[in-house]
Amino acid sequence: MSRDILHRYLFDNADVRGQLVQLEDSFQAMLAAQDYPKALQVLLGELMAATSLLTATIKFSGDISVQLQGDGPVSLAVINGNNELQLRGVARWKGELAKDASLPTLLGKGYMVITLTPDEGERYQGIVSLEHGTLAACLEEYFNQSEQLPTQIHLFATNAQAAGMLLQVLPSKQEQNDDFSHLSVLTQTIKPQELFDLGAEEVLHRLYHEEEVRLFEPMDVSFKCTCSRERSAGALKTLSLVELETILAEEGKIDMGCEYCTASYSFDAIDIAALFSDNADTSQTKTQ
C-alpha cells in the first residue's frame, strides 16, 4: 500500500469537507538531503503534510511555497511544490536542538509566509505570525484571515512518517457551523498512530462511523526536486568570469550542490568557458 497519498472527502449530510494525507517515502527522500536534528525532522514532516493539505484545498495551477522564518536557532524551514503535489523542502539551523523542541523554541519570533505563483494570473502571498504556538494553529489562522472559513488542522510527524487532517466548512456555507462543530469534536479524537498505521477508509470509519462520508479518488504525493545542470549553470552565469576563474585556479573545478536533494553538478574550465562563449554568441546575435 502506498504511503504517500492525499485523500479528499465530503460529508453528504453536512456542508463540510475534509482531507487526510499520509507521507512516508516522499518524506524520507526529503530528509535524505541533510542530517537534520530530530526536532527539525518533525517540523519538516509537519510542514510537508501542511503544504499537501493547503495545496489540495486551494484550486490553482502553479507553484506553492510555505516558508517559516524566525529569529530562533531555526532561521528557515520551507516546502516548495506545485499543484500536482510534487514537493521538496529544506531547513537552516544553528547549534543543537532539543529533541522535543516546540515551534516557538525552534523559530522564536517569526512568520509563516505562504506564496502562490499561478501559471496564469497574479502571485499571491499571505503572512501569519508564528505566535499561535503550533504549525497547525498558524495554518488555521491563515484560513481564518484569507478565506474566512472555519478550519481545523491536525499535523503529526516522527523522523519516519508524517500525516495530517483538514476539516473545513464549504465556502458557500460558512454561516452554518453546527455541523462543523460536531465533526470537529469527532476529528479531535484522532491519534497520531492511527494516521501512521491505518488506511484512509479505516481512519474515516473510526472517526465518522455514524456520518455519511464520500471518499474521492486519492492523489499521489511525491518528492521531486527541480534542480538540474542547466539551472546550476544559470546560477554560475550570475558571477563574473574572473570570479569563476579564481575558483577554478584554487579548486580545479566548481561543484554545485543542491540544498533540496543530494545531487551535485561539477563544472571544469572547459564547461565555464563554454558558458561564457554562449553568452558572447547570444550578445553578438542581439546586436547584429
UniProtKB/Swiss-Prot annotation:
Name of one Pfam family that matches: HSP33
Description of post-translational modifications: Under oxidizing conditions two disulfide bonds are formed involving the reactive cysteines. Under reducing conditions zinc is bound to the reactive cysteines and the protein is inactive.
Molecular function (Gene Ontology), one example: unfolded protein binding
Coiled coil: none
Keyword Cell membrane recorded: no
Protein purpose: Redox regulated molecular chaperone. Protects both thermally unfolding and oxidatively damaged proteins from irreversible aggregation. Plays an important role in the bacterial defense system toward oxidative stress.
UniProt similarity note: Belongs to the HSP33 family.
Protein name: 33 kDa chaperonin
Species per Swiss-Prot/TrEMBL record: Shewanella denitrificans (strain OS217 / ATCC BAA-1090 / DSM 15013)
Name of the coding gene: hslO
